[in-house]
Amino acid sequence: MTVQLTDEAYAVLEGRHADPFHYLGPHSEDNRVVVRALLPDATAVEAVGEHGETAHLERVHESGLFAGSLPNGSHRYQLRARFGDTTVDLEDPYRFPPILTDFDLYLLGEGTDQRLYDKLGAHPMALEGVNGVAFVVLAPNARRVSVVGDFNFWNPRRHQMRVRGNGYWELFVPGAAAGDHYKFDVVGPHGEQLPQKSDPMAFAAELRPKTASIVVDQTRLPQPRPAPAQINALGAPMSIYEVHLGSWRRKDGEQWLSYRELAETLPAYVREMGFTHVEFLPVSEHPFDGSWGYQPTGLYAPTSRFGTPEDFCALIDAFHAQGIGVLLDWVPGHFPDDPHGLGHFDGTALYEHANPLQGRHLDWGTLIYNYGRTEVVNFLVSNALFWLERYGIDGLRVDAVASMLYLDYSRPADGWVPNKFGGRENIEAIDFLRRFNAEVFAKFPHVTTAAEESTAWPQVSRPVEFGGLGFGYKWNMGWMHDTLNYISKDPIHRKFHHGQILFGLHYAFSENFILPLSHDEVVHGKRSILGRMPGDEWQRFANLRAYYAFMFAHPGKKLMFMGSEFGQEREWNHDRSLDWHLLDTPKYAGIQALVRDLNRLYRTLPALHQLDCDPFGFEWLVTDDADRNVFAWMRKGDDPRARCLVIANFSPNVYEDYRVRVPFPGRWREALNSDSAVYGGSNVGNAGEVHTLDGLVPELSLTIPPLAAIFLTPED
């Protein structure tokens, strides 16, 4: 047949047609079905109808454009193409119907599709009985988008996509399958060729430095068993073990453990140590090891460093089998500007702000999400819901919330753009955080969220309907800074800083707080937690034991970074395993034993956890003994008899006959003494119990051990 090439044909050949379906594939013309196919490397092509009818497709352009016709009604056919000496039967991607429905497009345009991960990305499926993969990507300003991969020899002319409403490009690729590697080849709005892009919605990716996305069949992922239903309840104990999966342990020198290898040891260790939760530093795919995961390029993909999505499911399941909740560090505040990532995705600032005063972090050299764009907010909120639903995650800790809330965060006076009211609050980010929390808790009421927020922003952990940001918890950065500053001082100087211990209780119940001794406190020259302790060797370890005991007795949930539980000496290094050999030395094993027992006590004594976030759960008893560095307080539970008396002595002196008033007469049992010889201490104490003195007011006469804290509970 004679084919006159039109402008539309050249638009397809030159890769600038927004809807190649309008030209390629089957088209009814003059009682025939005209078939056009673009197969750049083919030497001959036939169309074979479903009833066996065939038509020779003539090469009408040297770039591989073929055209011919079948009898009317032959819209289902295959292409029989010869490549050199090989002949293969191919399904024509341009004969299949659209993937996205009109309702899908409506929700996508409105930004209210909570299951974006069911629509966008790469999804293995059968369409009209043909197996393949449906690819959908957002690129509203692109002139052309092609999907390239293992299935088309990475040729961008083979599978040009069509644009639908609101800038979503789609294509069903017959024969593509789970495990295939792919990217999007994008031509920008001015005809410029962009770097090939990874899929923003990819469920897996190649190991760095490679950057291709990998097709995953999400419907075949095993569903981890659920964690205990009330594990995140406000009145339940919450003690979190923060872990960087790549450096907890290593094998054969310096090789990572896989997700499945970690599943064999890490959950059992966390359980043995008495922690209720584990929190992973970000597991989303990221190109740079040294970012620790905080500069992600693949928010929907568990990093391939440690295995596949199926392997990651196995790790979550192993934790849930031990009754341990799993929290993820989640990074919706910024992303790196790697060429294959989200930055300048369609040739414009699609995910980020175009103005660098709004769109770039000066400190980190990363790009900031544009929370004023509905597609971006939908992308992020759907990502949160994705982890909770598909992997059964029990909560999300949101990184760097302060950097999201303030437009002038870490910027010079002339380096930021005020909001519409002239203020520095990022109104769009506030709305995003509220929507994120509202949708998470509406769909998953038993999970939790936590904010790393380092300023005094009010009502971070108050419900959205009451004007708050809606988080379940907020990290208590003020407590962490004040108490670490206090404990790092020589005991002789601590009396001048007595208020650093007291001050935290002035605001301890203004939020639902987590007390964080996180990874940020053991890097960048800050030294390890043990490394901050003053004095000789005995005092350093005693100080650390006293500090940990103080932390577990203080109101608020607990978080401890890996290695701190046994007194790691070195700063954390993401390229090395923790120094597990230290546990061969009794003083480090003693620290580990103390943390294990503190976790046990915290979990089993209602007074230590039931009212963690309620002022009725705490009462100061001794606040004015600065000269002796002694504090005493009472922790309370729901039951009037649920009481725990705590005395902390941050001096190296022993105090005999130390008087403390208590609410009940009778015997008080010494539930824990951080100076016990079991933990490496001097074994000064009260022989396990003490009786109240005779008198009108119940009072205890105690022996207070040096650099230690003791816990006493009333006998029934």
Swiss-Prot record:
Named in its record, the pathway it takes part in is: Glycan biosynthesis; glycogen biosynthesis
Q: Spell out the CDD domains in the cross-references.
A: AmyAc_Glg_BE (cd11322), E_set_GBE_prok_N (cd02855)
Q: Name one GO biological process term.
A: glycogen biosynthetic process
Reactions listed under catalytic activity: Transfers a segment of a (1->4)-alpha-D-glucan chain to a primary hydroxy group in a similar glucan chain
Top enzyme category? transferase
Q: Name one GO cellular component term.
A: cytosol
According to the UniProt entry, what is the EC number of this protein? 2.4.1.18
* Chain's role: Catalyzes the formation of the alpha-1,6-glucosidic linkages in glycogen by scission of a 1,4-alpha-linked oligosaccharide from growing alpha-1,4-glucan chains and the subsequent attachment of the oligosaccharide to the alpha-1,6 position.
HAMAP family (UniProt xref): GlgB
Q: How does it assemble?
A: Monomer.
The name under which this protein is listed is 1,4-alpha-glucan branching enzyme GlgB
The opening ranks of the lineage are: Bacteria, Pseudomonadati, Pseudomonadota, Alphaproteobacteria, Hyphomicrobiales
Q: Which gene encodes it?
A: glgB
